[in-house]
Amino acid sequence: YTADITDNTVTITVPYTVSLNNAEVEFKYTTSATIIPDPETVTDWDNERTFRVTSYNGDAREYTYKVVKSEIESDGDVELKTTEEVASFAATKTTVVKGNLIIGSDAEEAEKITDISALASLKEVTGNIVIRNSYNGADLTGLDNIVSAGGLQVGSTDVASKATELHMISMKALETLSGDISVYNDQVTYVLFEKLATIEGSVMFNASSLQSFEFPVLTTVGQDLNLQGLNEENTAAGSIASLEIPELTSVGGVLSVNNLAKLTSMSFLKLKETGGLDFHTVPVMLETINLPEIETVNGSIIM
């Protein structure tokens, strides 16, 4: 690795996986100058330090040495169909996928993938994270360090996901999505996105086993927010009783909550504007729809 010198700063850029401790360093300077500390005595090259260079005539100048740890990027889509492929990709310590990340396969005889925890190095996926039918994990552990993504897709409106063991949808570090979340799976029970504040696209869930749906800091959904609990018989299901998205202020499209059989209350305490409201198929036992701050509905209200 070669360092760059700009003004009085010496900067070396290395992949975040590389340690420079005890590195062999080659440096050149005029033999009449002195450097304090002597670089030959330094072993900890991973940390910032200052070197004082004194020329033969007594002029002194200080240089700050800095290390920049760069991300490891993968260009294009990454498709992981087997446990071996997951392990091989994880070994690269990639932090950024510049494309879609596709986990599993929809093929009938595809190998089951039960563990993606080795993908913990990932911090960003610019495209969609797609979970296919052969993923057999109970949650998305391994994607917990992803801060931003283009979208998250589990199944679709045409074909529901058959990931039979997937009970929890959660990504602990996720803060922003530039696209959609779409989850169509009968086994998903718990949904939790602790840090997700902005979704530029839509939120689409159809989960007939739903018990909990938590977005504690979500403020903005750019398009529709649609939550459903239809089961395979096309009837209302789910055991969630109370729905609250406490910080939500804006939904660009329609806010729709329907076909949740046990729902008794829903609260959107800070919602000010939405493109529409659709609560046309709610259970008889629903007691409360709380929208105390609503000011603007740009479309229809259906109840």
PLM segments and residue spans:
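Beta-rich interaction/scaffold domains
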Residues: Y1-L80, S88-F89, T95-G99
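Concave beta-strand-loop units of leucine-rich repeat
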Residues: S74-E84, V97-T114, A118, E124-E244, ...
